[in-house]
Amino acid sequence: MNIDELTKRINELHKKHKEEGLSEDEHKEREELRKEYINRFKSNLREQLKGIEPKNKKN
């Protein structure tokens, strides 16, 4: 599942939760999807930060 599909499904589950509530399986799915989203976000941020070099290195 790509990040756009992941976000879309999380949003669908959130909307359903607010409107009518979630089943136990849907609640578990939402939590797993949120964890996956956060892990991907962290991974992408780490990779971006690896490529950043400070302008003035102080010793």
UniProtKB/Swiss-Prot annotation:
Cellular component GO terms, alphabetical: cytoplasm
Presence of keyword Iron-sulfur: no
Chain segments carrying region Disordered: 1-30
Family annotation (Pfam families): DUF896
Localization, UniProt: Cytoplasm
InterPro entries on file: DUF896
Keywords: Cytoplasm
Family matches, as PANTHER family: UPF0291 PROTEIN CBO2609/CLC_2481, UPF0291 PROTEIN YNZC
Family label: Belongs to the UPF0291 family.
Protein name in UniProt: UPF0291 protein CPE1003
Source organism of the structure: Clostridium perfringens (strain 13 / Type A)
